[in-house]
């Protein structure tokens, strides 16, 4: 099965079109103002129309209020809400009930204890995204270009459908997929020339690597 590929933090028509042309299954807009990948909802709404019907549109939020979500959903009309903050299971349930959209819950990982928090969200979140915990001093919950120990993912069973993020790029994506049960990967800094600047050439290089790769089967027991 081919993995889902999400290009996150898109801000320009050029990067959006290249991601779509090369086969991105998901495209993400970041609505966290401290991020260099932040985009105003009205601009995101215009870019989203280029992707509608071609890839899943993902709205990435961090501890959003209902007012935040009202604006984003009205202007962008996303297919999926990604919650990348400290949203509780109860808050995730409320968001799903109010907005009737699938939720991808992002979880920051440094060690096995971090993964144990997943249990509380199983059956609530529709999918998970596992990212590395931010380095000390970083204000960004994701997109830091930092990886974590993917062998930790062996703790998870097939109740957990997830994407991998955190420092994924053209050089390590095959290893990430082969050593875990991940059904998709999420790229942001891995296809940038500078923070927040998606590079169509790097997008090409990544998808060229995907096309050339012979992805091994997932590791036994992972």
Curated annotation (Swiss-Prot):
Annotated pathway: Amino-acid biosynthesis; L-tryptophan biosynthesis; L-tryptophan from chorismate: step 3/5
InterPro entries: Aldolase_TIM, PRAI_dom, RibuloseP-bd_barrel, TrpF_fam
Catalytic activities: N-(5-phospho-beta-D-ribosyl)anthranilate = 1-(2-carboxyphenylamino)-1-deoxy-D-ribulose 5-phosphate
Keywords: Amino-acid biosynthesis, Aromatic amino acid biosynthesis, Isomerase, Tryptophan biosynthesis
Molecular-function annotations in GO: phosphoribosylanthranilate isomerase activity
Enzyme class: isomerase
One Pfam family cited in the UniProt record for this chain: PRAI
Enzyme Commission number, as recorded: 5.3.1.24
UniProt-listed GO biological process terms: L-tryptophan biosynthetic process
PANTHER family reported in the protein's UniProt record: N-(5'-PHOSPHORIBOSYL)ANTHRANILATE ISOMERASE
Family stated for the protein in its record: Belongs to the TrpF family.
Record's protein name: N-(5'-phosphoribosyl)anthranilate isomerase
Naturally occurring in which organism (per UniProt): Rhizobium rhizogenes (strain K84 / ATCC BAA-868)
């Amino acid at each position: 099965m081919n993995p889902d590929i999400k290009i996150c933090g898109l801000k320009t028509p050029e990067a959006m079109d290249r991601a779509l042309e090369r086969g991105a299954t998901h495209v993400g807009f970041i609505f966290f103002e401290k991020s260099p990948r932040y985009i105003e909802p009205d601009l995101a709404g215009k870019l989203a129309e280029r992707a509608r019907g071609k890839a899943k549109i993902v709205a990435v939020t961090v501890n959003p209020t209902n007012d935040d979500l009202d604006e984003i959903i009205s202007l962008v009309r996303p297919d999926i809400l990604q919650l990348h903050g400290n949203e509780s299971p109860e808050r995730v349930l409320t968001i799903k009930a109010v907005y009737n959209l699938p939720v991808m819950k992002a979880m920051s990982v440094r060690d096995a204890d971090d993964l144990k928090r997943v249990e509380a969200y199983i059956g609530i979140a529709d999918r998970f995204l596992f990212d590395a915990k931010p380095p000390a001093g970083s204000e960004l919950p994701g997109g830091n270009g930092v990886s974590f120990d993917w062998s930790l993912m062996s703790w998870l069973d097939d109740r957990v459908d997830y994407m991998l993020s955190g420092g994924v790029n053209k050089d390590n994506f095959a290893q990430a997929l082969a050593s875990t049960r991940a059904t998709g990967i999420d790229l942001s800094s891995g296809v940038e020339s500078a923070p927040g600047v998606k590079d169509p050439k790097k997008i090409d290089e990544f998808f060229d690597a995907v096309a050339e790769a012979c992805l091994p089967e997932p590791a036994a027991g992972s």
